[in-house]
Design a protein with these regions (language model features):
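Conserved, mostly hydrophobic/aromatic
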Residues: 3, 39, 62, 101, ...
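C-terminal extensions of enzymes
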Residues: 340-375
Length: 375
């Protein structure tokens, strides 16, 4: 069995409607199919940023190198791609490209051995506690509270809210503004988080996510304001996920800190070495697929750190290891995944449960591919 081709399928204008939205949002995904000469197909998805550049890297650089190689030798291929194409930091476009390829390789491996990827990787747990990233910035404060009640009424007990882009007047900060130009008064965000806490009570886990928007002094103010709300974690508060600044922040707040979602393996190692996080958020579509994701999970376990984050691919990593602690269900992404894929893991009563189908256990929805494929 040898690698023969890679096909990229771009989907666009997929309608998804989060709770309380009157009009659907339009989303898109970039799918990857890795094919072998004997008919096996591995499914994956391109994550991260600079998608056109990532697609070009896959088609023009990585595919010619991979053709004719054994798809079951994921460690050999990862090592060879690392040394041939990038021995410096392993980040950005290169990482998104090899991550998508590695996930597809593991899908093929699971199908070849007729075993789910999560079992091949370790099989520590079949179900993982889930949290819902529901708190979109488009919601008003009242809508945010109502949406929180919706998810709790539907059996979910862990909720995450986006923060850091709304100023004291309740106005959105200018798109693309740097962290230095955003409001440094947390009053509106605290009001929104308080509205959610009041709506769902103290028994529901509540998290905040700033998506790397803040300077250290700003993050300290936000943390001090959030501390009475008993947050499970504050995710990626510091600009650039700066390990040293995150470590300083941890010393100034009792709120646990999470980070790492779009980072490479080497950047995750920096976070661990700097004692910068309480939770390491590993994403297989950026860390280097399952091959490097398992190494990152092992590194986290060695330092007694749980791992979080997630999508339908990451769930296999979380289920494989004993420190797989929280699986993210991002509302927009999950609704998109339900439109694009069949046989997704089951979300019910605050848990994600994986199936026993070989490989990733998911299939493409051919109707969605037909309806939303980019010309």
């Amino acid at each position: 069995m040898k690698i023969s081709d890679i096909e990229i399928i771009e989907l666009q204008n997929i309608p998804v409607t989060p709770p309380l939205f009157k009009q659907p949002l339009r989303t898109g995904v970039r799918l990857l199919k890795l094919k072998t000469d004997d008919g096996h197909v591995g499914l994956s998805q391109i994550g991260g940023f600079l998608h056109a550049a990532t697609i070009a890297a896959i088609k023009d650089e990585l595919l010619p190198f991979l053709k004719g190689k054994d798809p079951l030798e994921n460690e050999r291929l990862m090592h060879q791609m690392l040394w041939k194409f990038n021995t410096r930091a392993h980040g950005g476009v290169w990482n998104y490209a090899v991550s998508a390829i590695d996930v597809a390789l593991w899908d093929i491996k699971g199908k070849f051995y007729n075993t789910p990827v999560w079992r091949l990787l370790g099989g520590a747990q079949k179900a993982i506690p889930a949290y819902i990233t529901f708190g979109l910035r488009a919601y008003s404060r009242d809508e945010l509270a109502a949406a929180a009640k919706h998810w709790v009424a539907n059996g979910q007990s862990r909720l995450k809210v986006q923060v850091g882009r709304v100023n004291i007047r309740g106005e959105s900060d200018p798109g693309g503004a740097s962290a230095e130009h955003r409001s440094d008064n947390p009053a509106e965000d605290v009001g929104r988080m308080r509205a959610v806490r009041d709506a769902v009570g103290d028994d529901v886990e509540l998290m905040a996510d700033a998506n790397c928007l803040m300077k250290l002094d700003t993050a300290v103010r936000w943390c001090k304001a959030f501390e009475p709300l008993n947050l499970t974690w504050f995710e990626e508060p510091i600009v650039h996920n700066d390990p040293h600044l995150l470590a300083q922040l941890r010393k100034q707040t009792h709120i646990p800190i999470a980070a790492g979602q779009w980072e490479s393996f080497s950047r995750l190692a920096d976070l661990v070495r700097a004692d910068a996080v309480d939770f390491l958020n590993i994403h297989v579509l950026s860390v280097g697929g399952f091959t490097m994701g398992m190494k990152a999970a092992g590194l986290a376990q060695a330092f007694n750190l749980p791992i979080g984050n997630g999508d339908q691919f990451d769930f296999h990593l979380h289920a494989a290891v004993p420190n797989g602690w929280r699986a993210e269900i991002h509302v927009n992404n999950w609704l998109t995944a339900n439109a694009v894929y069949k046989e997704l893991p089951i979300l019910a009563n605050g848990w994600v449960t994986l199936n026993e189908k070989p490989g990733l256990g998911i299939e493409l929805n051919d109707d969605a591919v037909k309806d939303f494929r980019k010309p």
